[in-house]
Amino acid sequence: MGEFGEKSTTCGTVCLKYLLFTFNCCFWLAGLAVMAVGIWTLALKSDYISLLASGTYLATAYILVVAGIVVMVTGALGCCATFKERRNLLRLYFGLLLIIFLLEIIAGALAYIYYQQLNAELKENLKDTMTRRYHQPGHEGVTSAVDKLQQEFHCCGSNNSRDWQDSEWIHSGEAGGRVVPDSCCKTVVPGCGRRDHASNIYKVEGGCITKLETFIQEHLRIIGAVGLGIACVQVFGMLFTCCLYKSLKLEHY
């Protein structure tokens, strides 16, 4: 009976080791995906961050990058801990899994909360940002973001083209007689913003605010889904780790 019990325990331990190793390989790839989503958001989808009053969108992306890096390191540590059968390494591995789990839950929660608050924030701040900071010294990022927003989404002004009547730049001598920025034009040529007829500029119902809101919400959904999805998978990793730790403890005694 003793020999049978020892063989059963050893067999169970081996199975757990391979389960955890398989999990760690998948986990490492998941970490790469999480980091990629965070970097993708920062590098390619962050053009409009200067138009947002809150830093939540940016913070969420940074959390994903950090979580992705830690996940990859943890995955490598998990493989090492599994095959060396070192219980102290398994404890460290479990602790890191727990930290990553919390980071991804926070990222997902922030994305969800900001998703709910985005409409109110844009309504409160976007028009003011566009009219007061466009083409103003020290706000080159806002100017670039507004021009890209209006050209990429074929819109003009926060709510409509009339918003530009309140622009500090339009009322200054620097506007050169323009009534809207040139980026409002369907075909951008220098000075085209002097004529705001519908045949010349974009007059989209809802203005740029609805376009920007939809754009950011789509990416918040991706960030939230990735963060929470990987967090759910990690529960299995923590479970396998606990089982292997317990199995090694029983064999030790």
From Swiss-Prot:
Gene responsible for this protein: CD151
GO MF: integrin binding
InterPro entries noted in UniProt: Tetraspanin/Peripherin, Tetraspanin_animals, Tetraspanin_EC2_sf
Modification after translation: Palmitoylated. Palmitoylation by ZDHHC2 regulates CD151 expression, association with other tetraspanin family proteins and function in cell adhesion.
Residues passing through the membrane, by range: 19-39, 58-78, 92-112, 222-242
Residues covalently joined to lipid (S-palmitoyl cysteine): 11, 15, 242-243
Tagged with keyword Transmembrane: yes
Family: Belongs to the tetraspanin (TM4SF) family.
Record topology, Extracellular segments: 40-57, 113-221
Source organism per UniProt: Bos taurus (Bovine)
Name by which UniProt lists this protein: CD151 antigen
Entry-listed glycosylation sites: 159
